[in-house]
């Protein structure tokens, strides 16, 4: 192996030995690593002998170098991919947990609010039903009282009317009896006078007869009340 091949091999070896200890910037910059790989390959390509054995050996060394240079970036990319996947999975998991917590809290708040409104509506409905029942009972009571008062007034008016009719009838009967009494009293007085006159005539005739028989004279009063 020529001095140039050894130099290229030593350079590749140094790059290979230094590669695991590269800084985070180099490990996270695949472009820079690929550029270094290309430079090393170009230098090795210029120094390789055109003989078959040396060419095969040089090709093998190049393949080894390529594998050595490509393995760390792929590993870094894989690690970064896995890390990013873990971060995304963790973020999505945390976001999902937060969303579930928010949805659960909102659901609980909605249920509590619904229960509160349902309880208030139930109590209000019960109060309205109770008030409506009380109002109905009061209306029925007032209606019954009004009907009773109306019935009492009607009965009172009917009774008063009957009493007025009875009083009117009694007054009419009293007037009729008073008129009859007045007429009968006049008739009885006339009859009494006629009876007294007839009695007086009879007594006068008897007196006249007695005078004719020479009896002592009597006064008119004696004749009337004898």
From Swiss-Prot:
Polar residues biased stretches: 21-30
Region (Disordered): 1-72
Biased composition range(s): Basic and acidic residues: 1-18, 39-48, 56-65
InterPro entries xrefs: XLR/SYCP3, XLR/SYCP3/FAM9_dom
Tissue: Expressed in lymphoid cells.
Keywords, alphabetical: Coiled coil
Family in the record: Belongs to the XLR/SYCP3 family.
PANTHER family registered for this protein in UniProt: X-LINKED LYMPHOCYTE-REGULATED PROTEIN 3A-RELATED, XLR/SCP3/FAM9
Official protein name in the record: X-linked lymphocyte-regulated protein 3A
Organism: Mus musculus (Mouse)
